[in-house]
Amino acid sequence: SIRYNITLDEDFSDEEIWNVLKKVCLDERVKSLDNGLDHELENMGGILSGGEKQRLVLARVLIRDYPILILDEATSALDEKTAIRIENNILADNQLTLIMISHHIQEEIKQQLTECVELKV
């Protein structure tokens, strides 16, 4: 289910799950499913697009409130607008130390970073 894919059977409230789904811009999509959080996923995510699967994995990480995250191409399967919204939501957490690895970092996001290292070949 959506719930299990996020919680991996750990104890999180529905409110925590919905909050993290909103953070990754997946809340409306899950609300549209027949059983919401308890919608059963089949065949490697079945009805979810590649970008939705990527956001589900991101929700699984974010709900655990780790103090340090390393995200490698975490929004690569998303359109630019959605990627920026999610990255802004993640960067809004001032308690989080975040290392982002990306081939395409938007200027709006880059301006919010404490430091940005660009590797050029």
Regions found by a protein language model. Give the residues of each.
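Conserved catalytic loops of ABC-family nucleotide-binding domains
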Residues: N89-E108
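Walker B catalytic motif
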Residues: M44, E73-A74, L78-T82, I86
